[in-house]
């Protein structure tokens, strides 16, 4: 009852697990989420009719001009999958950029030459928060700071980092739309 939930990553299997026990659920629950084996490209989205030529061009322009990109959507809508496609394009356009990727659990996949992955520690006694990672990442001389999912207090820190010499960041947020 003291710790009724646990989120873990099983790296060998490339699986993320969320385990919950009463009292936060009515019965023990175990949820698995597997990392995709294939990373879709923006061109794949275009070919499937999920991305118009107009928005494809806008995204390419944003990558090239180091504009920040926020991918918004509901749970399970494909935010991370789409962000991985944007990362794939970034790796093609600017493979030399020093990237720092911050996540709660590793989900983003990037083939750039110079990438540093950092994850929060979900440990209840000693923890490294997303706010901490944003602060630390700014000391690593990144050209871009990319965040798997921005929520809560870390949103302010991310915006601050992007606007203090680290433009061209990407992130996802939970939202019903862009307004």
Regions found by a protein language model. Name each.
Residues 75:
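Anionic-ligand-binding alpha/beta catalytic cores of soluble enzymes and soluble regulatory domains
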Residues 1-65:
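P-loop NTP-binding catalytic core
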Residues 66-72, 81, 85-179:
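Switch/coupling sub-region of P-loop NTPases
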Residues 78:
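Conserved glycine(s) of the Walker
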